[in-house]
Amino acid sequence: MAAKDVKFGNDARVKMLEGVNVLADAVKVTLGPKGRNVVLDKSFGAPTITKDGVSVAREIELEDKFQNMGAQMVKEVASKANDAAGDGTTTATVLAQAIVNEGLKAVAAGMNPMDLKRGIDKAVIAAVEQLKELSVECNDTKAIAQVGTISANSDSSVGNIIAEAMEKVGRDGVITVEEGQALQDELDVVEGMQFDRGYLSPYFINNQEAGSVELENPFILLIDKKVSNIRELLPALEAVAKASRPLLIIAEDVEGEALATLVVNNMRGIVKVAAVKAPGFGDRRKAMLQDIAILTGGIVISEEVGLELEKVALEDLGQAKRVAITKENTTIIDGMGEEAMIQGRVAQIRQQIEDATSDYDKEKLQERVAKLAGGVAVIKVGAATEVEMKEKKDRVEDALHATRAAVEEGVVAGGGVALIRAASKIVDLEGDNEEQNVGIRVALRAMEAPIRQITKNAGDEESVVANNVKAGEGSYGYNAATGEYGDMLEMGILDPTKVTRSALQFAASVAGLMITTEAMVTDLPQKDGAGMPDMGGMGGMGGMGGMM
């Protein structure tokens, strides 16, 4: 085992604080409407330019092992805030730096670190309660657009496109962000249920120009097995032919004789039909087939529940107003299922989301809810260069997370004002002893750090602005973009409550751990030449003989 280097007490804390400050100083220049950019060198390709706090934090690795430990702990704050709310990473970093700096000064002055931490925790719990009271519901398109705009560094086009996407697919709809091909941002909305399975044969195509299959008012046959024998499908085909309506077959697979016969029937115009594979695999496929059944008002023909394909009647089939099938996707528009059944299914999947432990499962379940409840919107980010595209895509994703958080827990006045108001409401909070009171005051002072940093980045005098805002009430604050004071909610400067709350909680949690650190242990650096011993030359290789 390699030898270790150990530092204790003040020596350890000073080194750790240096690391915290290096990382936080690099991240905090991005805060606010006039925050600066940070350029990140990449081992290949063009450098990345970003104003995203967590992207900057992830790039930083310090040479000094003790300093690096401090930096990595603050990096954890940014990552946790990003995971919880998708935004607020820079605010969390600024808060953590402020708490650590103030807290370590108190420790150096002889305060008990454990009581300091308890005081900080008390202040944060009380401040979070105040934030919840200050929170205002965010349920109109204008407020959603404002939240998106603020999170995307005052880019109103991003805020507006996210608000439009949410309006079209609903709060539960899936909104994804992709790199577009044009210079402008584009919004592509898929209404109805779409899944990534295309037609099984190009001979089903009936719209030659678009290269797609389009079925008006089709019946939908859902089968939980492979079909290769056409005899199994005959009853359904005959019933649909009599009704003079098209048929969509969604099965695990349709192959061989069954597929060939369907193609021939379709080409001769005997019955308009198309077949696609069911989405997903294994248990997820069964669940998604059931989703489609509920959406279209049909039932899944499965031998597991004693239903046979040969005995299918028209009432077992689902129905929709329209189905569009391309090479890659199938979209079912306006399924004829009962609204109460669909809502029941959505509630059931939501419960599964709450119980799910893995992020992957949650994401897949969320997609299923969206497909049943709303639809899917794709925001295609447009830019002139690849560097700009990456930077903008990061901002759009941040803004999307922020708007989701705003819809979930509401909004508070932005620009660091909410933290100032929360702090002013708990200024009389008392701890169990004087050292806890110092911890409370450390947290209250730290809650001023975001507004000070926003003001500093805008080139204004931070103390003057902080005092003016503290003297005001409610959502009165400072708009760093224009240099004006006023009502932040009316000016459209909003932060999601969840983002502000998460930033404060994670910053205090990690900062508390750092304040109570008494020893640090790291590997001693390897001395050069400590690897393989010198081989002392290879000696002569001798003659190579008669090798050709």
UniProtKB/Swiss-Prot annotation:
It is an enzyme of class 5 (isomerase). One of its GO terms (molecular function) is isomerase activity. It is found in: Cytoplasm. The keyword Isomerase applies. ATP binds at residues 30-33, 51, 87-91, 415, 479-481, 495. Pfam families: Cpn60_TCP1 (PF00118). One of its GO terms (cellular component) is cytoplasm. The keyword Cytoplasm applies. Gene3D superfamilies: GroEL, GroEL-like equatorial domain, TCP-1-like chaperonin intermediate domain. HAMAP family: CH60. PANTHER family: 60 KDA HEAT SHOCK PROTEIN, MITOCHONDRIAL (PTHR45633). This is Chaperonin GroEL.
